[in-house]
Amino acid sequence: MKTLLLTLVVVTMVCLDLGYTRRCFNQQSSQPKTTKSCPPGENSCYNKQWRDHRGSITERGCGCPKVKPGIKLRCCESEDCNN
């Protein structure tokens, strides 16, 4: 009986996908592509671009941060959407 109950709990968790987290790219500028699993409840990714003395800079990650004027920001809500 305990085995049946445990099996039902596991199947329910798998079917409901309770542990789902968003995955976003998180590399900086021209670095090799890397991804990161976002914290639970964080459902968006961002791509932030600006220029400074080093040239054009790109930052990617989880969430949708507030930015200062002059910084381009694109937020999205699907897997790996911020490349």
UniProtKB/Swiss-Prot annotation:
GO terms for cellular component: extracellular region. Disulfide bonds join 24-45, 38-62, 64-75, 76-81. Pfam families: Toxin_cobra-type (PF21947). GO terms for molecular function: acetylcholine receptor inhibitor activity; ion channel regulator activity; toxin activity. Keywords: Acetylcholine receptor inhibiting toxin, Disulfide bond, Ion channel impairing toxin, Neurotoxin, Postsynaptic neurotoxin, Secreted, Signal, Toxin. The keyword Disulfide bond applies. Expressed by the venom gland. It is found in: Secreted. Residues 1-21 form the signal peptide. The keyword rRNA-binding does not apply. Gene3D superfamilies: CD59. Belongs to the three-finger toxin family. Short-chain subfamily. Type I alpha-neurotoxin sub-subfamily. Binds to muscle nicotinic acetylcholine receptor (nAChR) and inhibit acetylcholine from binding to the receptor, thereby impairing neuromuscular transmission. This is Short neurotoxin D. It comes from Laticauda colubrina (Yellow-lipped sea krait).
